């Protein structure tokens, strides 16, 4: 009888999907390739492509704009997590790309709980090609890695 009562009470509770809102912070770039040509505009476009790809590939994601992040001075982890939390995000995605040569790049991605500050997921990915398509593919791959880790 207790099991029946417990089942009825549990059925009356609102269903939760467990979906977590993910705030994607602006991607940062460390360029150590020493290329002579100034590629700041190309790199900014590619970082935006990466963020937009993640936004389209991750359920319940939102972009936290650079203008919002600029209110954190200095940009401490606590301040950035607070911005994400204030935006309604349960998790914040921090990404740093490192360009080591004209062809080789790495992504360091960390998903952090905005309430506790605990690291949920960390991925270090290598990819080749400093062009729009390579950054887009890297974004899709990272999103897939995040989905698989959450299953």
Residue ranges of predicted features:
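Cleavable N-terminal signal peptides
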Residues: 6-7, 17
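Glycine- and acidic-residue-enriched helix-capping/strand-helix junction motifs
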Residues: 35-49
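Hydrophobic alpha-helical transmembrane segments of integral membrane proteins
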Residues: 10-11
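C-terminal/domain-edge helix-coil "capping" segments
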Residues: 19-32, 49-53, 60, 83-86, ...
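Positively charged n-region of N-terminal signal peptides that target proteins for export
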Residues: 1-4
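Short, solvent-exposed, polar/charged sequence segments at loop or secondary-structure edges
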Residues: 57-94
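Short, glycine/charged-enriched secondary-structure capping and boundary segments
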Residues: 37-39, 107-110
